[in-house]
């Protein structure tokens, strides 16, 4: 438990202290956000706000994770694990793709960075590497970081994918989650605040899996998850980094996370869902991100078939802005929705445990 607190605290401190440094540095370099002309008129005032703040989130994540392990040496805590390093690597790789996207936008002074093909190739390389490695590194109880079974709260024994389909599934999750978080990052603090809530829920889930792991506590309801405590450190560091960044990203934002942050955080959600065996549960806990992405899919599909729009603008947080809601009202209410989704997900997680032990 101490390591989890250290991870969150270090990440928060690094993120909250580094972000204003980045604001000044990026402002001097002219690394400002370009705003879509077709977006809400109120957003035009945000043009030039420093972007690529995801660098601070990644720095906080790395500092929190490795710092907690360095402190853990003092009381013989377990070191870094395959699962933790894989999620950290996937997160960083997606952050690298996002950084390139942001940098191109800034250099060309437009709101379009990497083309769709280049971005998809970057996501593909990261996801395939993650998927292949996730089936290696067998640990106690012959567990690997990933599983060829589809999972809800734990593996569903009757649904087996096979290694090739599993790797393809990893790409689907990485692409879906990274793009979902990217689409959500359209209002000040919306993505960072929502991610803090989701990762906070996953701190609870991974710590519970650690306390009830089949490796150390075999019995009814135990969890076959490799390295749950190390995954808890990743979640805690991620949550701390997001909260620290949110201090400066809250409305009116002094800096945006950019694709550097949003793609990285989406990659983290994908990696955590796979390594914790909660791929379907993540859809519930991350329901806000799912809804934002779904609103875009619905808008495009309906418009192409009927030339009519379901929403005034997609993603649908802009729909409410154009309906007259203040930006801060949309943000706070969406945070509440993210909190409700996280609470429902935790309730489902615990109710499954009670059912498993016959409670």
Curated annotation (Swiss-Prot):
Sorted UniProt keywords: Cell cycle, Cell division, Cell membrane, Cell shape, Cell wall biogenesis/degradation, Magnesium, Membrane, Metal-binding, Peptidoglycan synthesis, Transferase, Transmembrane, Transmembrane helix
This enzyme's EC code(s): 2.7.8.13
Membrane topology, from the record: Multi-pass membrane protein
Main localization, broad class: membrane
Pathway(s) of this molecule: Cell wall biogenesis; peptidoglycan biosynthesis
GO cellular component, one term: plasma membrane
UniProt GO BP: cell division; cell wall organization; peptidoglycan biosynthetic process; regulation of cell shape
UniProt cofactor(s): Mg(2+)
Cited InterPro entries: Glycosyl_transferase_4, PNAcMuramoyl-5peptid_Trfase, PNAcMuramoyl-5peptid_Trfase_CS
Signal sequence bounds: none
Transmembrane feature ranges: 3-23, 53-73, 84-104, 117-137, 156-176, 187-207, 231-251, 255-275, 283-303, 330-350
Function: Catalyzes the initial step of the lipid cycle reactions in the biosynthesis of the cell wall peptidoglycan: transfers peptidoglycan precursor phospho-MurNAc-pentapeptide from UDP-MurNAc-pentapeptide onto the lipid carrier undecaprenyl phosphate, yielding undecaprenyl-pyrophosphoryl-MurNAc-pentapeptide, known as lipid I.
HAMAP family tied to this protein: MraY (MF_00038)
Family, per entry: Belongs to the glycosyltransferase 4 family. MraY subfamily.
Name of this protein: Phospho-N-acetylmuramoyl-pentapeptide-transferase
